[in-house]
Amino acid sequence: MKILRSLLVLALLLGAVGGLATTSAQDQVTITWWHIDTAESQAAVWQGLADEYMAAHPNVNIEITILENEAFKDRLVTVMQAGDPPDLFRSWGGGVLWQFAEAGLTRNIAPELEGEWKDSFSAKAALELYGKDGEYYGVPYTWGAVGIFYNKDLFEQAGLDPENPPTTWDEFLGAVQALKDAGITPIAIGQRDRWPGHFWWVYLAIRIGGEEAFLKAYNREGSFADEPFVQAGEYLQQLVALKPFAEGFLSLTYGDSQTQMVNQEAAMELMGQWAPGAYAGNNAELAAQLNLGWMPFPMIEGGAGNPDDVLGGGDGYAVGANAEDEAVDFLRFLTSVENQRMLANSALNTVPTVGAAEDAITDPIMQRILQARNEAPYFQLYYDQFLPPAVATAVLDAVDALFAEAASPEEAAEMIEEAAAAELE
């Protein structure tokens, strides 16, 4: 019953060709595949891989469904509640995927993954987020770090040195004020979708409390109402008080924030490694004109967190409970070294999860993100995917209230702790 309730909560949350296939040539197999890459250039990459696989496997038909991110999350919950998952579907791993697995809605691919396929992944921590207790339900195809993308030209207009971006929180706030003084919107954000804003609060909690604070709260040896999480809210509202966002940012979508960056209407965006690809998908011509830089989230002086700690994640595909062997084989094909190298230099602009493909990255920003991911002493998956759905929803609600200045830092932390106390064992 608890799992069914969690699935209902998800509606609010989600803020080389292998040799596994066993079906004979005369038996036709259909693979249903859901992804969220709606930009024509990005969708074409996935379609090309599907076409290549189907050409090599005439008995396989791959039906692709492309949905916008929020619509995908809503529709996925609906089909999961009906017990009819897609054969392959986009997943960020963590608690959301684990809930599906506990409800019997995913296929355990551990037997097929074991050996060469599993050993090929360099992003071991990422792979583990697609499994639990020895079982695996999918694999990641890209994995990186959330950081601040910034417009070097706008920095120069504000008198800031684009080659030496701020490294501390105080320096960052100073840069925000300098941009405002120059008549430039400092930060792009689409808070209507809520998940972009939670990156700010989680990163502040990481910088202030480090890994220890999170693990204590998660393992119920501490609380999400403890000081580091309250202080994260205080620092966030310190930023909000500077009014660094576009007017009406609470009602703007993630797509709107992409447009702000592409049109050079805002100087910075805290976002994952997919951002440059998203900018190109928004407007390829304008995106090509951007002079972008990337910086890690600033450190908090006196904070317990390591400045190299990373909030991040990426994208992968999970396997539905009723998927045929061919679906697993196709997933293996998607994460082959050859295709990982291709994806890194495609419109999807991925950060490979397979070690032998990492040298395919030539873009300096992506190289920095790969380095940050691989060298992070503590890597934390986004809270809205790692935590159980009810707790993740509480995080999104609480952080949204902080941005709206509708809750105090203490009240926001208590909102999260209340959900954690009810859901975490």
Describe the residue ranges of each PLM region.
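Conserved N-terminal structural module of periplasmic/extracytoplasmic solute-binding proteins
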Residues: 5, 20-103, 115-118, 162, ...
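Conserved C-terminal helix/tail region of periplasmic/extracytoplasmic solute-binding proteins
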Residues: 30, 61, 156-157, 162, ...
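Extracytoplasmic/periplasmic substrate-recognition and gating elements
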Residues: 51, 55-56, 82, 158, ...
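A structural signal for short loop-to-beta-strand junctions that line the ligand-binding cleft
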Residues: 86-87, 117-155, 185-186, 304-310, ...
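Hinge/lid segment of periplasmic solute-binding proteins
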Residues: 92-150, 173-174, 200, 228, ...
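Short, solvent-exposed loop/beta-turn-alpha elements that line the ligand-binding surface or hinge
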Residues: 107-124, 165, 191, 208-231, ...
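Extracytoplasmic/periplasmic solute-binding protein
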Residues: 133, 137-141, 146, 171-221, ...
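Glycine-centered hinge/linker elements that transmit conformational signals in sensory
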Residues: 174-178, 218-250
